[in-house]
Amino acid sequence: MALSAFLSVSVGLFASVVSATSGTEFEELVDENVRRLKAGKGCARCYLTGAMLRGAILHKANLRQVVMRNADLRWAYLNEVDLREADLTGSDLRGAWLEKNNLSGINLSRADLDGASMSEADLSGANLKSVYLSHAILSGADLRKAYLGDADLSMTDLSSANLTMAYLRKANFSDANLDGAILNYALARGANFSGANLNGAELRHADLSSADLTKANFRNANFSDANLNGAILSYALMRGANFSGANLNGVDLRHADLADVNLTGTDLSGLELSPDHLVAAVLCRTLTRWGEQNSGC
């Protein structure tokens, strides 16, 4: 379901509840739904806004399309819970377990998932705008086409995660582990990857313009045909990385290690580099300030 369609469904569900209840009736409705959950019953499309479910064990529960904004789910056990298209805007999920969950199309905007365990979760198409995911475990997670604008994923484990076509503008990945992650066609303009581990990551056709990759490790990473216009790669570890066909206009490469870096088909003519900087790089149809270089063809 598209994000706009999902939001209209959530608003419709909320409006129907409002028309039928008010005041303490809201609290009674939430309390009744919480009791259903704790009794092991499903609660698809339930109204659980503000619910207190700290430490609750909801293994394999059906919470599809639930409206659970600003809920307290700290340390809750939610493994394999169906939360497709659910609305958990602003909820507190610090330390929660959400491993192997189906969270496709979920709305977790502004939620706090500090230290949450979400390995192999399906977050494809999820709304994670401004979410706090620092120190979370998302290894092997599916984040294809997820919206992570302004999200904080600092020191998060995203090893082998799939972020193909994800929206990552101004997201914070500082010191995150993205070893072997897939970010092909991701939109990461202005994102912060400083100190991140991108060893062996796939970033083909990704938009990393104005991104900060200071001191990042992207040994053997694939940046072919990526847009790195104005990006900062100073002090980066780049040995074996592939930048063939990438846009490196205005890139800051100060003190970066370019040994064994594939620069085939790139234009470096506007960068302040000397032949010594490129002596160990792979150059083929590579434009520099001193002419086209073809030593690696």
Region roles according to the model:
Residues 2-13:
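Bacterial N-terminal signal peptides
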Residues 13, 17-21:
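Cleavable N-terminal signal peptides
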Residues 23-297:
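Tandem repeat scaffolds
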